[in-house]
Amino acid sequence: MRLRHLTLRHFRNVGFAALAFSGRQQFLVGLNGQGKTNLLEAAGFLTALRSFRTTDNKLLIQHGQHTGAISSELTHEQLGDTKLTIKLRRDGKELWSDATRVTRLADHLGRFPTVVFSSQDLHLVRGAPALRRRWLDLTLASMDAGYLRALQTYSRALADRNALLKRGNAADAELDAFEQQLAPAAVALLATRTAALALLGAKLAVAYDRLCAGDAAEKVGLHYEPSFDGPSTEAWLARFESSRGRDAQFRTTLVGPHRDDFSFVVRGTAAKDFASEGQQRSLVLALRLAQAEWGHEKSGTRPVLLADDVLGELDPLRRRRFWASIDPESQILATGTSLPDAELGEWQVFEVKSGEFEAAAETPEL
């Protein structure tokens, strides 16, 4: 997929910007706080109608404005030339595809993929389990409609069961009604997560090896940590039933896919506790490379890669290896406070200042 044009209106600190992209490499250069990340955020919003920086869409609308908009023109491997427009309001958003309003998330999710490389990705290694679950759910839901349906079913039934538990004195028959919905959905989520993390772990290891010059001592992977690994609906029903007393005590559901986690592993140990900062940064870069490769294999569509000033903390050799690891047919939009290394070929460069984007008079061969 190629992003040809991107237009922002009243988005973050950008009053208006219209950028035309040529070639596959665009670089946004400028000081911090000028709007580089805001443009990548807008491009990433195309994938799942959500920001990679915040869950509060009101923050996306420029201060003093009531609405905002993102418009894009893309060339897609299966869909051809397509125009997307996202209209933002303080109470919601609308998506339009070629002048037709899209009303179901399932009809859009994953069709126009992007993969974001962000400094916030370090939280996937260091942060709370909820961050890793959210990333995993978004990634799998964008690739697998069955996973999205199971996740939606599970989330609704979980909310209803928790409401009963919070109320107190829930009857077994009431709990059972929601457990009958939870159990088969949990089986589906567990199976998909298990297979996906095994595959992503293998791809992560290959990508990490490329970034780290084949250091065989640094064997890496992903380790799935389910709260319960029941193989069948019957096993899950029994587990939910046996947990009712404790769940009633704490007034919430204490077991299920919503309590799962996974960890990054280096040399057989948890990267969260034992890996250096350099290893952790390389792990999350490798994870995103693995995600992009797998997404292309699953959908036939190359995601647009969005790299938000993620390489500044890496040594020059590892930075060069990262750029060399990018699929040569993929488009990449990158940001930084200085231009990329000289041997990385020709970039279309935009200078960014105070929410304004100016194309370089001549794109230097950097």
UniProtKB/Swiss-Prot annotation:
SUPFAM superfamilies: P-loop containing nucleoside triphosphate hydrolases
Main location: cytoplasm
N-terminal signal peptide: none
One GO process term, biological-process aspect: double-strand break repair
Compartments in which it is found: Cytoplasm
GO cellular component terms listed in the entry, alphabetical order: cytoplasm
UniProt-annotated binding residues for ATP: 30-37
Keywords: ATP-binding, Cytoplasm, DNA damage, DNA repair, DNA replication, DNA-binding, Nucleotide-binding, SOS response
One Pfam family recorded for the sequence: SMC_N
GO MF annotation, one: ATP binding
Bilayer-crossing regions: none
Function summary: The RecF protein is involved in DNA metabolism; it is required for DNA replication and normal SOS inducibility. RecF binds preferentially to single-stranded, linear DNA. It also seems to bind ATP.
PANTHER family (alphabetical): DNA REPLICATION AND REPAIR PROTEIN RECF
Family in the record: Belongs to the RecF family.
Protein name: DNA replication and repair protein RecF
Organism: Opitutus terrae (strain DSM 11246 / JCM 15787 / PB90-1)
